[in-house]
Amino acid sequence: MKKLMNNIVAFCAICILSFIWVGCASEGPNEKPRQVEATPNFGVIHNEIIDEIFHSLSASTTRTSKMSKDEFMADCISEAAKTVISKDPTLSRQETEKTIANISMMPLEEIRLGMSDQDRQVIDSIASMLSNNIDANIIDDYIGTCHLDEQKIQAAKAFCETYQESLNYWNKCGAEWVEYIVQNVDVNVDVDEGVIGRWLDRISWKQVAFSDAYYGWYGMMSSGCNIYVGVGGAAAGSIFSALNQL
């Protein structure tokens, strides 16, 4: 019976991958998938920037009253731009902040509407594989079969890497963010441990991570594949997604 169940699971996994591959693969039988170029992990840099934003916000003691949500996001965008420029000093502060704001405040529905049919198919397939815990190397192989230009390859990788790292980050650090937001941002709740606990129970960090992945994709597309500007926009967008859960 155990052997039968293992065979069934393996068969189902093969079926999922075969279905996903059909949409992209039009190669001949001897054509190999395009090798996806190794680049810095978008998701790791993304988490570093979110963490730096949190520590900068937490260290500030100048406010005497709660911020509005708009003021909070403006501070997050400003801190994201500052952090990005510290990593790439050649960037303009004004243009970087403007691009990060445009990325992070773009509604997800509009991001999807702006995608081509192929973009949506590729991203939907990657999302399906991520939901089914398919190995990252297999997802890279899939991206290599999709006949994408270099910018879209990097954007697709950013989607995958952002989801994986964002989910890890929010599962680990989400409680700190919720506590900070409830204490410092006007979200119409009183501060007590019970309220914070109830918010944590209702938040879906997986949903935040998937929203974040779209910001990762859009960040790379909107910044012309400047990884630091793109990841800065995705980091601010991730915080915006978490804020919208409250």
Functional labels for PLM-detected ranges:
Residues 24-201:
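N-terminal propeptides/leader regions of secreted preproproteins
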